[in-house]
Amino acid sequence: MNAKNLSQNSKQARAKSGLIAAALLVWILVPTGAQAILGIGEPAPSFSLVSGDNKKLTLDRLRGKIVVLFYATRDTVQVNDDLQNYLDTLYATQPKNIQNQIFRLLVVNAMEATSLTTWKENLIKTSAKLKITIYGDWTGDMFAAYRMRDNDSNFIIIDKRGIVRFAASGRIDNSRFEAIKKLLLELAT
């Protein structure tokens, strides 16, 4: 090998190590899970959930409906209350034909439930209070398949064909509510 080839190989190695260092830096600086939630256009993975009163629900049963999914841990269920209230009002003001196309799905990560009976009782009470069935992800299968962010509020819209049309985690700013409304109404018509 001559000096020219060694110099070229050395430059390539430095460039490669620079790229690796940059990728590692991005990985370190990006909050855990920020890049992980499902992407727009991806097929929604199947799921199987159970409510506090043992009602079972699967994605297959929701085909043909727009799924508005809120997934949170016990400590983060209130993070997106403003968005939930906004969407509840939007839903209530829509004609029946639009309401029938939208399924509002509230899921709580229940993987760490120490007392299933207590958790289920609380899900039943909260479901009655909110007038909507809340489901538990008892096994963590949905959490893993949907690449949910841990200890955060996750919000996903799935279209009638089972394709993810919106996905975000953390608090969703009020400035995005109108765009979410527009998307939902477009999907329903």
Where does each model-flagged region fall?
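Sec/Tat signal peptide C-region and signal peptidase I cleavage site
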Residues: 32-36
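Structural microenvironment flanking redox-active thiols in thiol-disulfide oxidoreductases
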Residues: 76-126
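Thiol-/selenol-based redox modules, centered on thioredoxin-like
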Residues: 151-189
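Short, internal strand/loop/helix patches
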Residues: 103-107, 117-152
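A short beta-strand-turn-helix
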Residues: 48-66
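N-terminal secretory signal peptides that target proteins for export/translocation
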Residues: 1-14
